[in-house]
């Protein structure tokens, strides 16, 4: 959204931004998808080739990371991920080829070793622009760096060397700058993801649902305790 009213009981949105919800999907599940799920979809759409490619996803335990990992694996990418230990078993069960604890000083070296010492063809960074910039040397020639939290202001590597492509993601900016064609693609992606959620092909992050009066407490929990859960409030 590009204006106030995120916590309003009713709000107006353009018809082109609406998605039908399958009957098999709960209201809570439907509400938990668009922001993290479509952000992940946009991030992966920046990568021209995924099948067989080595893709590093940092912050893979976040709600966006959870969707990004699943969608990348569906497209045949060889995924490597950094996340807190509580997410490691789930990531390995999905088929992630290398998992490391981001708090370990050697986490990047561990994932590079898991990739046979080869550079990554793509990196999706869900942590910070500073980390993304620091990861550029781990990206191979003609590789793609996708940042979700901030942008790399200036490529620190020499020109005409690694020839990296730098991408930034801002789902909310589509409300101001997206064309009808882009909205049609985004909504189609959301509809397909909802169908996969209804069939069990895609899984949601853990949901924490509270009544509207609990909103201040839930916002505090997001800031202090967020570990990949998706926080929702019932408005009504």
What are these regions (language model features)?
Residues 8, 52, 96, 119-120:
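Local beta-strand N-terminus motif with an aromatic residue
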Residues 158-208:
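C-terminal substrate-binding/catalytic core of Rossmann-like NAD(P)-dependent dehydrogenases/reductases
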Residues 1-19:
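Glycine-rich phosphate/adenylate-binding loop and adjacent beta-alpha elements
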Residues 198-208, 216-236:
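C-terminal capping/lid region of NAD(P)-dependent oxidoreductase domains
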Residues 99-167:
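Glycine-rich cofactor phosphate-binding loops and adjacent beta1-alpha1 units
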Residues 31-104:
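Mid-domain Rossmann-like dinucleotide-binding core that forms the NAD(H)/NADP(H) cofactor-binding site
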Residues 11, 89-94, 154-161:
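Short loop/helix-cap segments at secondary-structure boundaries that form the rim of catalytic
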Residues 23-26, 48-55, 118:
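Short helix-loop-beta connector
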């Amino acid at each position: 959204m590009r204006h106030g009213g995120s916590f309003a009981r009713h709000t107006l949105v353009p018809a082109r931004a609406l998605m039908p919800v399958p009957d098999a999907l709960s209201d809570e599940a439907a509400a938990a998808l668009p922001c993290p799920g479509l952000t992940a979809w946009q991030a992966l759409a920046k990568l021209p080739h995924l099948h067989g490619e080595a893709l590093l996803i940092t912050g893979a335990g976040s709600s966006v990371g959870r969707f990004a990992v699943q969608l990348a694996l569906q497209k045949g990418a060889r995924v490597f991920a950094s996340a807190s230990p509580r997410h490691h078993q789930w990531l390995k069960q999905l088929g992630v080829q290398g998992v490391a604890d981001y708090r370990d000083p050697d986490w990047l070296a561990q994932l590079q070793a898991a990739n046979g010492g080869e550079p990554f063809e793509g990196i999706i960074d869900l942590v910070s622009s500073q980390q993304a910039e620091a990861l550029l040397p781990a990206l191979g020639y003609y590789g793609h760096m996708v940042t979700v939290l901030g942008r790399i202001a200036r490529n620190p590597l020499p020109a005409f060397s690694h020839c990296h492509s730098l991408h930034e993601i801002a789902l909310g900016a589509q409300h101001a700058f997206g064309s009808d064609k882009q909205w049609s693609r985004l909504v189609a992606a959301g509809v397909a993801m909802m169908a996969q959620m209804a069939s069990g092909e895609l899984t949601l992050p853990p949901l924490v649902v509270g009544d509207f009066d609990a909103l201040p407490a839930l916002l505090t929990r997001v800031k202090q305790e967020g570990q990949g859960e998706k926080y929702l409030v019932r408005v009504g």
